[in-house]
From Swiss-Prot:
Its EC number is 2.3.1.1. One of its GO terms (cellular component) is cytoplasm. Belongs to the acetyltransferase family. ArgA subfamily. One of its GO terms (biological process) is L-arginine biosynthetic process. Pfam families: AA_kinase, Acetyltransf_7. This is Amino-acid acetyltransferase. Residues 286-425 form the N-acetyltransferase domain. It comes from the Bacteria. It comes from Pseudomonas fluorescens (strain Pf0-1).
């Protein structure tokens, strides 16, 4: 079977979920200059064709720097913000104007050899962002550098209803007719909040947030962000992370940080279960909970391969439906990726931990320990004093977690009478 067939099948739930949703996508000026920019445009057009309502915000910092250098002007910053005097503002207007036209031209391609053939999409822009001056801070006059006052929510939604891609530039206008240079991250964040967007997608140079060990941080809650900001200092990763967290605090369900250098990063983040960047979300991305009858299908998908290998005892759908209240599960993006069951042994103060299983793709994230802790908590709440487990393959895992070797003779009578000598499982117990 071709690989793309399998990919489409797995992506279909996300295609349905994203249809008619509003996404704000921020692409910095470095991303527009990157060789991968053409692929990003193709992916944006694909999202539009799948029914996503798109607001695209572009940056222009390197383009402004180029124009300042060409005129022999020195850029000035204070606390990471550009000081935009009159001469600098001319460079800003020139850079933003040319960049906006170049992006519109890319989005208008309709060549037979292009993935955009037949798209015929419309790009809309205009005076949709109202700004105000930052003014004087710590004795420093920022001149024409501003901050977003509001975005035209009704106007943008009307354009989105007409199936246009809305393009916002890092310029804002005041009611008195002044022009202000804005940070594209500020524009994107405020647009996402004011529009009540479903997602804010921020492009950066890296795959996402990189931790102190050089590894990608895949998921964060907004309350975890300050610690990372302190570690990062004042680099661009910190700006993106701060924007993502601010959007979530403002009501945006999910913010994503992805790489403009990675071909397909946007699609991977949106149409696969684990994504390819960093997700900042208010709600839990992964949830440990008690199982419900609706989980039976997911449980069967999880445990059937292990049953075929002889690792787990076979359980039919009927058995799972009847015993579903004994199970705890780990759910990730609607998929059951781990489970465990607790059975109270009749006429005793002991219980049995059974059917502990973790999807092979998620076996190194501590989910087995999470489920074991949950089962032990449930057992104590039921007044149980001892927890037994019978296993053929994972004896060492349980030994490392406080289980001691036991025997059939130690099992309560009700469980000992059901022991399968042909399976010859090893027995362990743990005092609670």
């Amino acid at each position: 079977m071709p690989e793309y067939v399998n990919w489409l099948r797995h992506a279909s739930p996300y295609i349905n979920a994203h249809r008619d949703c509003t996404f704000v996508v921020m692409l910095p000026g470095d991303g527009v200059e990157h060789p991968n920019f053409g692929n990003i445009v193709h992916d944006i057009v694909l999202l539009h064709s799948l029914g996503v309502r798109l607001v695209l915000v572009h940056g222009s910092r390197p383009q402004i720097e180029t124009r300042l250098a060409a005129r022999g002007l020195t850029p000035h910053y204070h606390h990471g913000m550009r000081i935009t005097d009159a001469a600098t503002l001319e460079c800003v207007i020139d850079a933003v104007g040319q960049l906006r036209i170049a992006i519109e031209a890319r989005l208008s391609m309709d060549m037979a050899s292009s993935p955009m053939q037949g798209s015929r999409l419309r790009v809309a822009s205009g005076n949709l962002v109202t700004a105000r001056p930052i003014g004087v801070l710590e004795g420093v006059d920022y001149h024409h550098t501003g901050e977003v006052r509001r975005v035209d929510r009704k106007g943008i939604n009307r354009l989105l209803d007409e199936r246009s891609i809305v393009l916002l530039s890092p310029l804002g206008y005041s009611p008195t007719g002044e022009i202000f240079n804005l940070a594209c991250e500020d524009v994107a964040t405020r647009a996402a909040i004011d529009l009540g967007a479903d997602k804010l997608l921020l492009f950066g140079a890296d795959l996402g947030l990189i931790d102190e060990n050089g590894k990608l941080v895949r998921e964060l809650r907004p309350q975890q962000v300050p610690a990372h900001l302190q570690r990062l200092g004042s680099n661009y990763q910190a700006e993106l992370l701060d924007a993502a967290a601010e959007a979530c605090r403002g009501g945006v369900a999910r913010s994503h940080i992805v790489s403009y250098a990675e071909d397909g990063a946007l699609l991977t983040e949106l149409f696969t279960r684990d994504g390819g960047g960093t997700l900042v979300a208010q709600e839990q991305f992964e949830l440990v909970r008690e199982a419900a009858i609706e989980d039976v299908g997911g449980l069967l998908d999880l445990i059937s391969p292990l049953e075929e290998q002889g690792i787990l005892v076979r359980r039919s759908r009927e058995v799972l439906e009847r015993e579903i209240e004994q199970f705890s599960v780990v759910e990730r993006e609607g998929m059951i990726i781990a489970c465990a069951a607790l059975y109270q042994i009749a006429d005793s103060d002991a219980g049995e931990l059974a059917c502990l299983a973790v999807n092979p793709e998620y076996r190194h994230g501590g989910r087995g320990d999470e489920l074991l802790e949950r089962i032990e908590t449930r057992a104590r709440a039921q007044g149980l004093k001892t927890l037994f487990v019978l296993t053929t393959r994972t004896a060492h895992w349980f030994r490392e977690r406080g289980f001691e070797p036991s025997s059939v003779e130690r099992l309560p009578a009700a469980r000992a009478s059901l022991y399968n000598y042909q399976r010859n499982s090893k027995i362990f117990e743990k005092s609670l």
